[in-house]
Amino acid sequence: MSIGGDWQKRRVGNLEGLGGIDRRTFVKLSGMSAAALIFGLGPFTEEAVARTRFSDYPFSLGVASGDPLPSGVVLWTRLAPNPLAEDGKGGMPPLKVPVYWEVAEDERFRKVVRRGKGFARPELAHSLHVEVRGLKPAREYFYRFRAGSELSPTGRTKTAPVPGASVGALAFAFASCQMYEHGYYTAYRRMSEEDLDLVVHLGDYIYEYGPNEYVAQSGNVRTHNSPEIFTLSEYRNRHALYKTDEDLQAAHAAFPWIVTWDDHEVENNYADEVSEVDSEPDQDPVVFLGRRAAAYQAYYEHMPLRRASVPTGPDMLLYRRVTYGDLAEFNVLDTRQYRDDQATSDPERQDPSRTITGEEQEQWLFNGLATSRAHWKVLAQQVFFAKREPDEGESYSMDAWDGYLGSRNRVLKFIQDQRIANPIVLTGDVHNNWAAELKANFDHPNSETLGVEFIGTSITSGGDGAATPGPDQQAILEENPHIRFFNGQRGYVRCRLRPELWRTDYRVLPYVKEPGAPIYTKASFAVEAGRPGLQVVSETAVPSRASSLIESDAKRIRAQESADERRRGGRR
């Protein structure tokens, strides 16, 4: 079957006759959203309420909370008695279903402080996003849902302190890149056992590939449940597949999350309205906008996000700011939706007009940094920020900030000119742990250090990994003296901060091919307030399965190119 024919058979909506329209027309054609136009979502008019009897346990995808404020938090669940139903509806009827929720100060719900009723509606895959208000700041709470006679698991959450309030400490973890096929989510189980206030997810929550298209060096251990995803039902099912994992559910239930996306929530290396260069039908921008609308809607449906992030067709507001008293302010960035296309040459990447954030988001970031009263100004974002000069014969990553020098230079110049104190950049994407100092001029190692960047490894993506640098990574460390640390194992990064000190611990697993791995701290770094730069606290030898399984950038790119080749071969 041809690629085009396969797409035509699997898509939900009808794209015929839409060629040549622009984004504005695309969105206006739908009174509700572009997703409704392309993927067959009509406005909900059925007022009947389903009798709440389920074919199986409806809370199969767990519970979650997110985007904490001093007075409240978002509570999330999705009713899905058959979570992997092929139509993407989770085994639910096309009717709204009442869901009751309650929040208590104790785990046994003896002191309930808030309760209410919402409706899980089919147009949002029977997901529920409850924006609870009236809670006390900096408090632990417990929550649960009820639908019919079924009770959800209990979740724990915590509100943020009041902006400007004196806060003595904060503990959080950040994570990214959880390719389902590459390993087990033991890292999330270990994370759920930590004493944390918050989790920050930096993207690649799902991967779009078909079964065994993207193969880890250590081999795949689980299998995606459908070919590459394009339609709303398929994106819904992929999110559901990932969320059926009990370790991931445990981490969601244990802490509030702040989430942002990278590329694989839609498609590898997409840039704004530009699809990855391949032979798929979404090379047509109109088709890609339809795909993006489906992906964005499914993302919203499965994340604890506020109404401000409800997508309008192929557009969704995800960048936002979360404040923890006077201690930390998180500027959560979106480096996918507004970026210029990736550069194809060195002169192009050096073009000062190029942007990875878009002008509006960049100005929003600058305004936030300039007015923040927090001790620590955090940029929670996706791709490598510091310069990473490659080894001889390799090229810069055009997908990272190295491919958008204008954007990076403007951010660093603003930090330097405005004397922004204590900026910290948090990064995912590259499937390895790194730590770097941010220089006023990366070409001059003795130039002023303006801040630091902590780059976190993947939860599973890339397979088992290795504890020590290989030749490629060693060359990068030698070429880039501002990059101070490397580790290639899986895990997450834990950060514990006080007004005077930020401490980062790289938490790693010896393997992910099998469940149940122990967790170790490979290295710890400290940053003193007012003294930007990395201080090594400790670095320890930890167990590792092999030294040859590091997924370098080159290997990762080759593996994803191989995935494209397998996909094309499977569709001939």
Predicted regions and their residues:
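Metal-dependent phosphoester/phosphodiester hydrolase catalytic core
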Residues: 2-572
